[in-house]
Amino acid sequence: MKIHEYQGKEILRKFGVAVPRGKPVFSVDDAVKAAEELGGPVWVVKAQIHAGGRGKGGGVKVAKSLDQVREYSEQILGMQLVTHQTGPEGQKVNRLLIEEGADIKKELYVGLVIDRVSQKIVVMASSEGGMDVEEVAEKTPELIHKIAVDPATGLKDAEADELATKIGVPAASLPQARAILQGLYKAFWETDASLAEINPLILTGDGKVIALDAKFNFDSNALFRHPEIVAYRDLDEEDPAEVEASKFDLAYISLDGNIGCLVNGAGLAMATMDTIKLFGGEPANFLDVGGGATTEKVTEAFKIMLKNPNLTAILVNIFGGIMRCDVIAEGVIAASKAVSLKVPLVVRMKGTNEDLGKKMLAESGLPIIAADSMEEAAQKVVAAAAGKA
């Protein structure tokens, strides 16, 4: 789960991380009012969407008068903001963050992720923060410094100081940088985050260290113990199909192709998509119905896939372990009838009650294309999607 920058800063503030004063707003008039309350002479008008690269996309503007605050708010609020993370369609800006300006002397970068190899949280930092940190990581990886943190001790003072020194924080500002690094680590740990970034972390002209941005992603499997994080969820920022799928415990991710995939098991789902691409097709989605799929879940899965206007065929690929093939067959038949299926449907089943499932499909009277192997299923669905079946 992702949250907005201003929400991330609320979390950072709770953990003692210095952030600029700011106010989230939903209208142009409120933006001007917020700027008046914050006081000038400089403000930053920032689009709030769940994507990076807002500055390059025109979603962050520095205003030097209240008239400019109004002008920039009118420009940004309601725009389709296109960044390298949104795709060509962009994301609509429904809210802004009006923030006090800062005297930026140097931009740094700090981020935390989980390293699954070492099974530790890794703190990354660079002296080259700002909008082009991805380019820095790609072209000059030696400028990215890392520390794997022992979970038994947390981020120690010496580790924080070493990292801060490597990225150019002067000695006089080390206590502030240490507090920010340790606060960010503690926030990451206590909220079950999967990613946390401050980009940029700035040094000001008078030696202050301030988090000028905040990005958090959270482990969705841990949200049950963080109702305060769930309260930050903004459904307007999420794919409507993915939101609908989550209501039925379906793991669904929209993709850019035209072949719908309904599979049980994440590994098999990824292998299925790879095989479709191997034979020249493009998956329209990732969809894992899990091991406890019911007729209702399969029907809802079909409904969600069919809302995609680009869909031209569907592949159902089932390995019957915990999930019985006859249950899936029953669901496929019911779903096909319920939605009046008009696109070609390829079904491949292996495992528990496989013969019964195949018999049910064959006797259903529906124009279902059967396949015995994943390769055959992929070839058939690619051909069907192209109108060659």
Swiss-Prot record:
EC number(s) reported in the record: 6.2.1.5
Name of the top EC class for this enzyme: ligase
GO terms classed as biological process: succinyl-CoA metabolic process; tricarboxylic acid cycle
InterPro entries to which the protein is assigned, alphabetical: ATP-grasp, ATP-grasp_succ-CoA_synth-type, ATP_grasp_subdomain_1, Succ-CoA_synthase_bsu_CS, SUCC_ACL_C, Succ_CoA_ligase-like_bsu, Succinyl-CoA_synth-like
Domain ATP-grasp as annotated: residue spans: 9-244
Binding, substrate: 264, 321-323
MF-aspect GO terms: ATP binding; magnesium ion binding; succinate-CoA ligase (ADP-forming) activity; succinate-CoA ligase (GDP-forming) activity
Binding site for Mg(2+): 199, 213
GO CC list: cytosol; succinate-CoA ligase complex
Cofactor binding note: Binds 1 Mg(2+) ion per subunit.
Ligand binding (ATP): 46, 53-55, 99, 102, 107
Gene3D superfamilies for the chain: ATP-grasp fold, A domain, ATP-grasp fold, B domain, Succinyl-CoA synthetase domains
Cofactor entry: Mg(2+)
Reaction catalysis annotation: succinate + ATP + CoA = succinyl-CoA + ADP + phosphate; GTP + succinate + CoA = succinyl-CoA + GDP + phosphate
Alphabetic keyword roster: ATP-binding, Ligase, Magnesium, Metal-binding, Nucleotide-binding, Tricarboxylic acid cycle
Stretches of the chain forming a coiled coil according to its record: none
NCBIfam families membership: PRK00696.1, sucCoAbeta
HAMAP family the record matches: Succ_CoA_beta
Name this protein carries in UniProt: Succinate--CoA ligase [ADP-forming] subunit beta
Taxonomic path: Bacteria, Pseudomonadati, Pseudomonadota, Betaproteobacteria, Burkholderiales
